[in-house]
UniProtKB/Swiss-Prot annotation:
GO terms for cellular component: cytosol. GO terms for molecular function: flavin adenine dinucleotide binding. PROSITE patterns: GIDA_1, GIDA_2. GO terms for biological process: tRNA methylation; tRNA wobble uridine modification. SUPFAM superfamilies: FAD/NAD(P)-binding domain (SSF51905). FAD binds at G14, A15, G16, H17, A18, G19. Transmembrane segments: none annotated. NAD-binding protein involved in the addition of a carboxymethylaminomethyl (cmnm) group at the wobble position (U34) of certain tRNAs, forming tRNA-cmnm(5)s(2)U34. This is tRNA uridine 5-carboxymethylaminomethyl modification enzyme MnmG. It holds the Pfam family GIDA_C_1st. Its cofactor is FAD. Homodimer. Heterotetramer of two MnmE and two MnmG subunits.
Length: 611
């Protein structure tokens, strides 16, 4: 075993979406960083759908950009269709989504990492961890190399003891075509990490030239929509394409029903629990038996390939059933499968042994991010990578930890949920997980979080000043519209009051009063409209947050003895000792902790402070 001569500040294990974000931000903050991956040709590979964003997820990508991360930038560079979802619904649930060229996404990310000062990329498979008295020292690889590091970030995705299922066939793999990582799970178990299994899956890929698109509904993109916050209109650098919508048939249902026992999921061969909101097609047929058909979305995988992703047909059926099932779908009667669908089981670590910083409670200096923490999705993984990278560097530099709150970001919501809840399925972000989602809109992420990005050294002063200028423009224009009165309909009202009417949009107001209503650009126009239209709701949510903040942010001492607080219920004592929450707010969100327990805990914390 040879020891590499460099002692890195941060070693990142895995170069998926979590690992790439962790490595980039660590290096950007001035750390010496090594990222290890079993295959340099699969950096930032989009293993499942060729898309970034969506409801809740798109909000997270915007937050990553506001903090100085890179997912938004790489998505904009490689996007081949951009849309805003839920445009007819309220502003809190509107979200950007992009189809991306899978190869271009990998190329742009790899190029960006390679050109980042202080960041070294190395091909190697990590087999074990090095630690001394529960303090991380480095890692060893299958290739016989020891790498020393002050901190280590594990971002192993679905590779830890990954097991692929296609019908009654199963074999080890991190994803189809890539080997599983077997050593890491054993290394974590040896150190007392609680580990369980989760499951996810992916649909077959088809050859576009074999599909009859004439019977499918075309779904084009929206112009001018990107993920990076910018002060000029967004023009995608790649050619833009359409997606298509088709549907299953009665024949599809019959094929699945006749072969349900051959599914790895329903045949009892899978122990891991899959994502509730991304079910397999056999799951949908069984659980929604009364539904005549299910939508299928045909999504291009890139502009230089004929392969398409068939969203909605994830399955663990054997290949012969997949073949017949695909050809029963409207427009896919002659479809050629290029890659089979499969399910995959993998190991994950329980959240009660992880701090909200994503540092483990068992081995100091060891951070975990992405699917190893029980999440599903590229966006959730990237956000965790960003947080893990920031806090790894802060630990090395002996700086305070960075934990965004759930009141100011979806990233904060996720961190709090992962470390206070017992997961019984893969965790996916939705806007409904946030208590104050009207304040956490995708359009105002830069206004909420950019000061953190600047202070951390991830966001340039120039970009920060652009965001601050945008914030000031919105505030100034809001004040001006509140002071400008015009006759509108049968009465004289302020232009802000006129904009509050349901039938009046900012564009309509501009057309009606062109000399009094400024065109700030589509992004700022939309933000200003939301700030004015929903001002009452926004003010109420801000007031609620302010009233709760004193108790929410009350810090619980690390050395508090829950067992000695006799007024706590037995369940509360057990749960608090298990999760060791850092604040009263986090404690209040642990399942099984009653309001009465929180009141008792607050008294105990105050008493502890005076001892």
């Amino acid at each position: 075993m040879w020891t590499h001569p460099i002692n890195y500040d941060v070693i990142v294990v895995g170069a998926g979406h979590a690992g790439c974000e962790a490595a980039f931000c660590s290096a950007k903050m001035g750390a010496s960083v090594l990222i290890l991956t079993s295959n340099l040709d699969t950096i930032a590979k989009l293993s499942c759908n060729p898309a970034v964003g969506g409801i809740g997820k798109g909000h997270i990508v915007r937050e990553i950009d506001a903090l100085g991360g890179i997912m938004a930038e790489v998505t904009d560079q490689s996007g081949i269709q951009f849309r805003i979802l839920n445009q007819t619904k309220g502003p809190a649930v509107r979200a950007p989504r992009a189809q991306v060229d899978k190869q271009m996404y990998h190329i742009h990310m790899k190029r960006l990492l390679e050109s980042t000062p202080g960041l070294h990329i190395m091909q190697g498979t990590v087999e074990s961890l090095l630690d001394n008295e529960n303090v991380i020292q480095g890692v060893t690889t299958k290739e016989g190399i020891t790498y020393l590091g002050k901190t280590v970030i594990l971002s192993s995705g679905t590779f830890m003891r990954g097991l692929i299922h296609i019908g009654d066939l199963n074999f080890p793999g991190g994803r189809l075509g890539d080997p599983a990582a077997t050593g890491l799970s054993a290394a974590l178990k040896e150190r007392g990490f609680p580990i369980s299994r989760l499951k996810t899956g992916t649909p077959p890929r088809l050859l576009a030239s074999s599909i009859d698109f004439s019977v499918a509904e075309e779904q084009p993109g929206d112009p001018g929509v990107g993920f990076v916050h910018r002060d000029e209109p967004f023009v995608p650098p790649l050619p833009q394409v359409s997606c298509y919508i088709t549907h299953t048939t009665q024949k599809t249902k019959d094929i699945i029903a006749a072969n349900i026992s051959r599914s790895a999921l329903y045949g009892g061969r899978i122990e891991g629990i899959g994502p509730r909101y991304c079910p397999s097609i056999e799951d949908k047929i069984v659980k929604f038996a009364d539904k005549e058909r299910h939508h299928i979305f045909i999504e291009p995988e890139g502009i230089y390939t004929q392969e398409v992703y068939v969203n909605g047909l994830s399955t663990s059926m054997p290949f012969d059933v997949q073949y017949n099932m695909i050809r029963s779908v409207h427009g896919l009667e002659n479809a050629i499968i290029t890659r089979p669908a499969y399910a995959i089981e993998y190991d994950y670590v329980h959240g009660n042994v992880i701090y909200p910083t994503l540092e483990s409670k068992i081995v100091e200096g060891l951070f975990l991010c992405g699917q190893i923490n029980g999440t599903t999705g590229y966006e959730e993984a990237a956000a965790q990578g960003l947080i893990a990278g920031i806090n790894a560097v802060n630990k090395v530099l002996k700086k305070p930890a960075f934990i965004p709150s759930r009141q100011e970001s979806y990233i904060g919501v996720m961190l709090d949920d992962l470390t206070t809840q017992v997961l019984d399925e893969p965790y996916r972000m939705f806007t409904g997980r946030a208590e104050h989602r009207l304040l956490l809109r995708q359009d105002n992420a830069c206004l909420r979080l950019s000061h953190y990005g600047r202070d951390l050294g991830l966001l340039s002063q120039e970009r920060y000043e652009i965001f601050e200028n945008q914030k000031q423009i919105i505030e100034d224009e809001k004040a001006r519209l509140n002071k400008t009165f015009k006759k509108y309909g049968n009465s004289v009202v302020s232009l802000a009051k006129a904009l509050c009417r349901p039938e009046v949009s900012y564009d309509i107001l501009r057309e009606t009063f062109p000399d009094d209503v400024r065109d700030l650009g589509s992004t700022l126009n939309a933000s200003l409209e939301m700030e004015i239209k929903y001002a009452g709701y926004i003010d109420r949510q801000k007031s609620l947050i302010h009233s709760l903040s004193k108790s929410e942010n009350m810090v619980i001492p690390e050395d508090i003895d829950y067992q000695s607080i006799s007024s706590l219920s037995l369940e509360a004592r057990e749960k608090l000792a298990k999760f060791t929450p850092r604040t009263i707010g986090s404690a209040s969100r642990i399942s099984g902790i009653a309001c009465a327990d929180i009141q008792v805990l607050m008294v105990a914390v105050k008493k502890h402070a005076h001892q």
